Amino acid sequence: LVRHFVQQGFQTVGMKPVAAGAEMMNGRLLNSDVAALIKAGNVDADLALINPYVFAPAIAPHIASEQAGVKVSLDNIQQAFDGLQSQAEMVMVEGAGGFRAPINRQETMADLAVKLNLPIIMVVGVRLGCINHALMTAGSIRAAGLTLAGWVANRIDPDMLAIEENIATLKAMIKAPCIADVAWGEEPQFIDL
């Protein structure tokens, strides 16, 4: 999505507020998703704004933060987001772990999305069980008072049976447009933005 908006001529930056699973690069922890967001964007923003919380172990972010003795704060994330908004026309925020994944012992990615008042683009890993999971997540997004702006069909299981039928069911039942259908191992081609 970041690359798409850059190609459309927007000053665009990606943000991953909380990331777990990082390696030392030039004396700082860097998560591979964050590196990809930086590469895709066209705004030279401070890494501390793009990724305010980063932890080395590839485990649930709230557990990684506890092990590091760090409390993830929605207010700090809001300040970083506001800083990015002052530098870019588009700030694309990537979650971690799913819509209801905890970021600390009291708050989840859903709370973060509500605080930042973000429209949501849901990524559906197309595999057995994805219909139920996607419909529950879409319902959870709406119950939080947020807009489900669209969804992406990410074909993560190249051997899935009845894949086209599953995607057709998702398109019929999710009350938002499918903005991309990503084949196994390919880059997304956006359908409807």
For every predicted segment, state its role.
Residues 50-53, 95, 181-184:
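Conserved beta-strand termini and adjacent loop/short-helix elements that scaffold enzyme active sites
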Residues 74, 78, 188-193:
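Short, amphipathic alpha-helical "lid/cap" segments that border enzyme active or binding sites
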Residues 25-26, 61-65, 102-104, 133, ...:
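Short, well-ordered secondary-structure micro-motifs
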Residues 59, 172-190:
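Beta-strand-loop-alpha "switch" segments that mediate conformational coupling across diverse proteins
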Residues 3-8, 38, 165-172, 185-188:
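Short, basic phosphate-binding NTP loop
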Residues 19-22, 127, 156, 186:
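Short, glycine/serine-rich, charged loops/turns that create anion-binding
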Residues 76, 83, 90, 95-175, ...:
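Conserved catalytic-core segment of NTP-binding enzymes
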Residues 2-71, 75, 80-83:
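N-terminal phosphate/diphosphate-binding loop that engages ATP/GTP or pyrophosphate donors
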